[in-house]
Amino acid sequence: MTTHKFEHPLNEKTRIYLRVESLLRQAHLASGFADNHQYQLFFRALFDMVEIFEQIQLKSELAKDLEKQRLSYRHWLNVEGVDQEALNSLLNEIDVVHSQLMGAERFGQALKEDRFLSSIRQRFNLPGGSCCFDLPALHYWLHLPIERKKHDANQWQKSLKPLSDALTLWLKLARETGHFKAQIARAGFFQSDADEANILRLHIPMKYGVYPMISGHKNRFAIKFMAFENGQACSQDVEFELAVCS
């Protein structure tokens, strides 16, 4: 059965984490510059991340969240039936990633200080502003050998590696706390309680032709399914799978 997967954050911090994860993925996928237009996606992702970093102290928040996960997993040390080797390996991974995160400079600082990036960032935000007459420096860079462009892209992304590693680990562990269970949204509506949850994950069969509209917070949430073809609230029962992740 064909399904579409959907995630929804239940607090603002997790919302930002998911946005940054998406931007990191976009930058990585576009950095191969397989066609002449991927550079727009690449630079847009970089500049969007810089804007987020300017507004939020993401480094300190992520460090605190990793520490919470570490303390949570330490409670399982010496507990009978728990794979202690795997647990110690995970705790070591958290320690290494946390240490690298704390030793890193402010997120996005290297990107802001890069002469080329800073020269194109402002005009890149203009509608259609990536034309050669608006950004001659970018136009020149685009005509450099592909090896040079890939090298530059890798260096810019390398400055974000401590962030990427920490965010990837935190989201991986958060997602693994939830287990998918079959649910039914009666007349297209479902609501439930949550216990300090961060993320909802849904698997929705495409046959229903619906998408979810979700509201709520870490302790309670509601899901209303909308029909894609007309944008109206769905009136049929919808069977789907749901994982509540903390």
Curated annotation (Swiss-Prot):
Main subcellular localisation: cytoplasm
Keyword field: Cell cycle, Cell division, Cytoplasm, Septation
GO cellular component terms listed in the entry, alphabetical order: cell division site; cytoplasm
Disulfide bonds: none
Coiled-coil region list: none
GO terms of biological process kind: division septum assembly; FtsZ-dependent cytokinesis
Keyword Disulfide bond recorded: no
InterPro entries (alphabetical): ZapD, ZapD_C, ZapD_sf
Location in the cell: Cytoplasm
Complexes and interactors: Interacts with FtsZ.
Protein role: Cell division factor that enhances FtsZ-ring assembly. Directly interacts with FtsZ and promotes bundling of FtsZ protofilaments, with a reduction in FtsZ GTPase activity.
Membership in a protein family: Belongs to the ZapD family.
Protein name, per record: Cell division protein ZapD
UniProt lineage: Bacteria, Pseudomonadati, Pseudomonadota, Gammaproteobacteria, Vibrionales
